[in-house]
Swiss-Prot record:
Name of the gene encoding the protein in the UniProt record: dnaB
Leading EC class: isomerase
EC number of this enzyme: 5.6.2.3
Keywords for the protein's UniProt record, in alphabetical order: ATP-binding, DNA replication, DNA-binding, Helicase, Hydrolase, Isomerase, Nucleotide-binding, Primosome
Stated family: Belongs to the helicase family. DnaB subfamily.
A Gene Ontology BP annotation from the UniProt entry: DNA replication, synthesis of primer
Name used for this protein in its record: Replicative DNA helicase DnaB
């Protein structure tokens, strides 16, 4: 076996440049031509701004010219050489932009503005390559420094790669005026929706009215004692998002297998008793219903992952991929205490606290609601009314702190067989960072593996 085969060779092809300094990827002519087109036509400006940002230009003066054009365009002003020259002069940037003569040079390089969008794509691709090179350099440095836990380094490396093609880069800080503008835009958008939902629907009318749906960046905790229906409720949320509203959702199951999940989904959607499916005692009419339901839900964008011993690093990596591939809208994890970090920790409480914080950060990074199921300790069973409380969240107080919404699931009939509220459940919204708390009464239809809105009286 040669040195090259075991990875000890230099790795460069013969004749490849061994110079430590290389010019980052860029295309000077494409940058000039895109700007030239923008100076010739407002239509070209619209084409270019869809694919290029100022930071995508490699040549500093090109970014200055682009920003000046964009400023004029956003105010409805002409974007020709004369107006851009005037704008740059007012800003004191004309000399840094190459002067008026350079602006005329840009327009002379392109006979027509028709291809500006094509040139802009080249500029954007080169910028993407530069970000990839920069990310690779940072990952290499992380590997050589080897500071911290290996799995943390792997996660940071994945985040670097995700940032190359992921969400639009933003500054760590923004002025108040920008934050207020975003808030006003959201209020305006809500106004035009005529009171309809702005977040991901849960499928429960009263809960949706309370929360206005589950919102991007939120971490939602659904907690209960064992065998009260946490997984069933989580699947109801998944059904509402993916099947009823076509919103890409991933369900990480660390407890049930994929076939069990699929069977529960079919039972809930087809209204065929789950026990009949398990025993194989479905009749012909039920088979017809199941077949029709399968055809209806087959193409729903619901993704199920039942990988055993799943680590937080793996969950993050899979969510990032789905965000890029299908525009992921919601993440569900069943359940928090079954997750593993894959590394040594001082205590289980510390580990669960890290999971909680990391999931909140994941929700903010991907701008999706993340629903995490959690076990409650034995606190409710020691109370006369058996009602759960926030203090019952198991193994970590940080879960309550990190969560935007905490829903405590309670069924009186689980403790008393002859309870008059058999077939009912309470969704106790014990924490709601952006709104009021409330107890939402729902119907528990255990034979169909689902919760549902209470029937109107």
């Amino acid at each position: 076996m040669s040195i090259a085969h075991i990875g000890l060779a230099d790795g460069r092809e013969q004749g490849e440049d061994r110079s430590p300094e290389r010019t980052p990827p860029h295309d000077l002519l494409a940058e000039q031509s895109a700007l030239g087109g923008m100076l010739l036509s407002k239509d070209a400006v619209a084409d270019v701004v869809e694919v290029v940002r100022g930071t995508d230009f490699y040549i500093p003066k090109h970014e200055i010219v682009y920003d000046a054009i964009l400023s004029l365009y956003s105010h409805g002003e002409p974007t020709d050489v004369i107006t851009v020259t005037d704008e740059l002069t007012k800003l004191g940037e004309l000399s840094r932009a190459g002067g008026a003569e350079y602006l005329h040079t840009l327009t002379s390089l392109v006979p027509t503005a028709a291809n500006a969008g094509y040139y802009a794509n080249i500029v954007a691709e080169k910028a993407l390559l530069r970000r990839l090179v920069e990310a690779g350099t940072r990952i290499t440095q992380m590997g050589y420094k080897a500071e911290g836990e290996v799995l943390d380094l792997v996660n940071n490396a994945q985040a670097e790669i995700y940032s190359v093609t992921g969400t639009q880069e933003v500054e760590d800080y923004v002025p108040l005026t920008e934050a207020v503008t975003v808030a006003i835009d959201e209020i305006e958008a809500s106004k035009h929706k005529d009171g309809s939902m702005t977040g991901v629907p849960t499928g429960f009318t009263e809960l949706d009215e309370l929360t206005n749906g589950l919102h991007p960046g939120q971490m939602i905790i659904v907690a209960a004692r064992p065998a009260l229906g946490k997984s069933t409720l989580a699947l109801d949320f998944a059904r509402a998002a993916a099947i009823k509203h076509d919103l890409p959702t991933i369900f990480f199951s660390l407890e049930m297998g994929r076939s069990e999940i699929a069977m529960r989904l079919l039972s809930a959607e087809a209204t065929v008793p789950l026990q009949h499916m398990r025993k194989g005692t479905v009749d012909n009419r039920d088979w017809t219903t199941i077949a029709a339901t399968r055809g209806r839900i087959n193409d729903a964008p619901l993704y199920i992952d039942d990988s055993p011993n799943m680590t937080l690093v793996e969950i993050r990596a899979k969510c990032r991929r789905l965000k890029q591939r299908v525009g992921l809208k919601m993440v569900i994890i069943d359940y928090l205490q079954l997750m593993t970090s894959g590394k040594r920790v001082e205590s289980r409480q510390q580990e669960v606290s890290e999971f909680s914080r990391a999931l909140k950060l994941l929700a903010k990074e991907l701008q999706v609601p993340v629903i995490a199921l959690s076990q409650l300790n034995r606190g409710p069973e020691q109370r006369a009314d058996k009602l759960p409380a926030l203090s019952d969240l198991r193994e970590s107080g940080s879960i309550e702190q990190d969560a935007d919404v905490v829903v405590l699931l309670h069924r009186e009939s689980a403790y008393e067989k002859d309870n008059p509220r058999a077939g009912e459940a309470d969704l106790i919204v014990a924490k709601h960072r952006n709104g009021p708390t409330k107890t939402v009464k729902v119907a528990f239809q255990g034979m169909y593996s689902r919760f549902a809105d209470m029937a109107p009286i």
